[in-house]
Amino acid sequence: MAENVLEAVSVNKYFYDPVKFRVLTNLSFSIEKGTFVSVVGKSGCGKSTLLYILSTMDTDYEGEIILDREYLHEKNSDELAAIRNAKIGFVFQFHYLIEEFNVLRNVMLPGIKLGKLSKQELEARAYEQLKMLGVSDQALKRPNQLSGGQKQRVSIARALINEPLIIMGDEPTGNLDKKNSDIVFGIFQDLCAEKKQTLLIVTHDLDFAKRSDRVIEMRDGQIMT
């Protein structure tokens, strides 16, 4: 029987300004370990709102989120930050690399925050991730010296540095051309197939979504598939 990495149970979300409005309606689903899941739907359907709840960055919701068999809703902000750093890797539309640091240091940052490895161990792991993603030759460069596709590969390496249970992405190919979008998709596919990495990716790219293992379609705050 497959192990569930992430579960949402009867999740509801409201916005209150200017009037009370339900954004997410009674969402329940689970994601099995080692699956590549895409979330699709029109703008405003609640995709990114759901992702922020699942990633523990939004705690103002009804229902329950279970990550690695831990119930998250009653945990405080410090506990959630620790869980987020240890168990979730993030890849966004924008890379959010720090220009003052070189590529290697950027990849190491979540590991430095976690504090489980020595600097030498962390450097070695960061370099291995960059090598796997084909950008190890850029390790000592600053982000502004990289192409858009290279920056996104570096951000994926950063997401992997703490060996997370799940990688969550919000439009990770949104700023990329077709060639680089395909490269990023291939990286995700390989991570899932070879390393049993669990992926949950919000995307507008239906071609990207169709090639993943599973598609969750959202409409007006509800799950259709």
PLM ranges: what are they?
Residues 1-4, 225:
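Short, Lys/Arg-enriched, disordered terminal segments
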Residues 215-225:
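H-loop (His-switch) and adjacent beta-strand-loop-beta switch element
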